[in-house]
Amino acid sequence: MELETLISWLLFSTSLFWFLFLATKTKSKPPKTPSSTTNTPIPKSYPIFGSAFSLLANFHRRIQWTSDILQTIPSSTFVLHRPFGARQVFTAQPAVVQHILRTNFTCYGKGLTFYQSINDFLGDGIFNADGESWKFQRQISSHEFNTRSLRKFVETVVDVELSDRLVPVLSQASNSQTTLDFQDILQRLTFDNICMIAFGYDPEYLLPSLPEIPFAKAFDESSQLSIERLNALIPLLWKVKRFLNIGVERQLKEAVAEVRGLATKIVKNKKKELKEKALQSESESVDLLSRFLSSGHSDESFVTDMVISIILAGRDTTSAALTWFFWLLSKHSHVENEILKEITGKSETVGYDEVKDMVYTHAALCESMRLYPPLPVDTKVAVHDDVLPDGTLVKKGWRVTYHIYAMGRSEKIWGPDWAEFRPERWLSRDEVGKWSFVGIDYYSYPVFQAGPRVCIGKEMAFLQMKRVVAGIMGRFRVVPAMVEGIEPEYTAHFTSVMKGGFPVKIEKRSPLV
């Protein structure tokens, strides 16, 4: 710890000395892009250190800070100067999003910085892959995600988790009038679900005792510390710590070892299980790992990387979306009533066809994710020089970030009522009062990405979320137990979270008829 502190102070002191010296000698020049006007709040930039001072001052609210800048710029695009000459383009313009995600897709990849930051945790999984590796994983994943048998398996997994675990936990909280952290409950629920769907492995995270599970804890630490690497202003610092195996880098190494150790063990056991089933002519398992192995992809490292990426993508995004959804629902009783009308008369285990009919619920989930997207930003790296549709020059190696959070709050996209939680903006209603979903193009609403990298698990995510919403709302009312009038803080790790959790009371609802 003393060595780590010494190294950190040496790097910080050297950086601070040069920053103060250069700041007194040189004033910044605004970047030569269409975003640069004398009235925009683009932060000052200094030689070597760029806009590090502004970045550090706003790091705790960097999502909101960069969103605020984008809202005041006519082009909805600006260039941020990072330390040591690096540049990062931020945009909230649909035409630019379409350009980087579809029109000029081959120019923009994950990049070396992302790969190095995440590789220890995700390996070469689809979430961390580019080029031919990504294409191959995308192809086999798309095939498996679109099978009817997987959809039925997802339905079964979610139904069992709801009836056997979530409902008893909420009933117990209602009877005892205890306060629950609903964000934690949803994270446990979705972790159990996605582990079963991906691995056929039940971590038993959502039990009445709300146990601490080493695998879940290690998974959280691995994702959080990996994203801290990615957000580091001075990447050299974490690389030095990793080399010396000290501080958070030692913690990350231990967490990753726990995750990958158990994952590898599960893969080995699954291969053995599949061989035994084949010998006994038993029906095959339908979880994703079994599907990958049965289709000839037997390399343990490859399938482990793929499945860990799927768990990461499916766990935190779904719980984040549901957390903010239930908070917004508590503030808008008319939306709650419309959803209750929609689920009234449906079976306790809502079937696939019934889920498809939950049009208003679908719109409410989309509207919630517009204001509070599970993934607030997404960043690509330019493979070669490019010019964006608004004229912004992008050099090879520059980061280009499309700001999903800012786009969901853009008056240019959503109109003057953008701040209102209004599911009806996604709907049309016929003369007999039946809702139909209208939607919006992916490039104005890139919550599930767009183009070739559009989320392959989107339909599975909506299936899971709508079944959970119906399962909870048909039995309980979720009542926030936080200070009245204070909005929870939206903050981002790998995905968004409600800072400090979501304390709630659970009230039993009269049976819907």
UniProtKB/Swiss-Prot annotation:
Localization, per the record, is: Endoplasmic reticulum membrane
Matches recorded under Gene3D superfamilies: Cytochrome P450
Q: Which organism is it from?
A: Vicia sativa
User: Source organism's superkingdom?
Assistant: Eukaryota
Protein name, as recorded: Cytochrome P450 94A2
PANTHER family the UniProt entry points to: CYTOCHROME P450 (PTHR24296)
Protein purpose: Catalyzes the omega-hydroxylation of various fatty acids (FA). The substrate specificity is higher for myristate > laurate = palmitate (C14>C16=C12).
Q: Which cofactor does it need?
A: heme
